[in-house]
């Protein structure tokens, strides 16, 4: 799945560069190269390492997105 995402992002970046390559300045080109390198690092990393991305359980992700952890901490203090 990660390979598919990488290929899709890479295709989008390549097409964007081909169509607007003359409009990109040096900082923008460096940003594109940096993002491509990060995506490549994530794709080629072992599944459990995920290139230094901290592992969170699904419940932790949901709670952090909904802000439930802050509410639970406040409720626990009462």
Swiss-Prot record:
| Organs and tissues of expression | Eyestalk sinus gland.
- Residues spanning the signal sequence: 1-21
Keyword entries, A-Z: Amidation, Cleavage on pair of basic residues, Hormone, Neurotransmitter, Secreted, Signal
The regions listed as transmembrane in this protein's record are none
- UniProt record, GO biological process: chemical synaptic transmission
In its keyword annotation, does this UniProt entry include Cell membrane? no
| Compartment(s) where it occurs, according to its Swiss-Prot or TrEMBL record | Secreted
Q: Which residues carry this modification: Alanine amide?
A: 75
The GO terms this record gives for MF are:
hormone activity
Chief site of localization: secreted
GO cellular component terms listed in the entry, alphabetical order? extracellular region; synapse
Superkingdom is Eukaryota
Q: Does the keyword Repeat apply?
A: no
Q: Describe the task this protein carries out.
A: The pigment-dispersing hormone causes the migration of the distal retinal pigment into the proximal end of the pigment chromatophore cells and thus decreases the amount of light entering the retinulas. May also function as a neurotransmitter and/or neuromodulator.
Q: What family name appears in the similarity comment? A: Belongs to the arthropod PDH family.
Report the protein name in the record: Pigment-dispersing hormone 2 peptides
Q: Which organism is it from?
A: Callinectes sapidus (Blue crab)
Lineage here is: Eukaryota, Metazoa, Ecdysozoa, Arthropoda, Crustacea
This protein's gene is called: PDH2
């Amino acid at each position: 799945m990660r390979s598919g995402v990488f290929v899709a992002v890479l295709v989008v970046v390549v097409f964007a560069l081909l169509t607007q390559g003359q409009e990109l300045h040096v900082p923008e080109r460096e940003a594109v190269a940096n993002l491509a390198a990060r995506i490549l690092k994530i794709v080629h990393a072992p599944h459990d390492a995920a290139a230094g991305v901290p592992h969170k359980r699904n419940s932790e992700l949901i709670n952090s997105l909904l802000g439930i952890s802050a509410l639970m901490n406040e409720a626990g203090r009462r």
